[in-house]
Amino acid sequence: DSRVKLIATATIGFDHIDTAWCAAHGIEVTTAAGCNARGVLQWVGAALVHLSRTQGWQPAERTLGIVGVGHVGSLVKAYAEGWGFRVVCCDPPREERERCGFRTLEEVAREADILTFHTPLDASTRHMADSRLFGLMKPGAILINSSRGEVVDGEALLRSGLGWALDVWEHEPHLDPALLENALLATPHIAGYSEQGKANATAMSVASLARRFGLPLEGWYPPQAAPARRRPISWQELCRTIGGAYDIASESRSLKERPGDFESMRDHYAYRREYF
């Protein structure tokens, strides 16, 4: 029997933990799910602004498909609707539980001009975006992935004729050179790297310890990080301000020029400050 009673990971995922073994040995596992949702939202916002500028469209002219409507996807949905996109969503587990009118993956793929993935990685989502799905999408549609690299079949994406903007990659840190070179945007798995996201993850892990072991630390938050001011932001304001908060195009150029620095870029990242 293990002396370990709790594993509190300060990450949103748990694919690095053998949860079945832990459950069989009475070890509780908690994650920091949702800790960096606003950081990812702002990465997606920066990507959309960049794409609209370089391709010459406005949100009202585009349908945004969202796959996975959890912590991140629900935020992207709310803000994207406010920015003027037509939004269609797919989340089979939530649809089964809640009957909330979400669409099938195939329907969303057919309708979307831009398809963004916000799913965990498990057996049902591995290579969810494959050649069959790409064949349903509009010519010239764009795929965005900031969830897990293995959600997308990279080899099939290369053959798809679609555009893509990727923060996560199969076989990280070893990136497919063609996938990287041809990406509209390419970043080194840092979509959620915000000051507040890091602080939230730490606070959530401490809260798990406090609850499990009766420690007087409920409500603790890292004193050096101010929680984000959550507020609506218009498309016009986003276009004016996002470049000052996060230069996604510059970061993309850096990764394309120095793909071998993938891990170093992550390890020495200057965490962004959330501002909406």
Q: Which role fits each region the language model picked out?
A:
Residues D1-G56:
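Phosphate/diphosphate ligand-binding glycine-rich loop within oxidoreductases
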Residues S2-K5, H25-E28, F85, K138-A141, ...:
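A short helix->loop->beta-strand "cap" motif at the edges of active sites that frequently abuts
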Residues A33, L41, Q58-E81:
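Glycine-rich adenosine-cofactor-binding loop
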Residues L41-W57, G82-F85, T202-R211:
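Oxidoreductase and adenylate-handling cofactor-binding alpha/beta cores
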Residues E81-R99:
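NAD(P)-binding Rossmann-fold cofactor-contacting core
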Residues R94-A178:
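Rossmann-like adenosine-cofactor binding region
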Residues G140, S146-F276:
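Rossmann-like dinucleotide-binding domain for NAD(H)/NADP(H)
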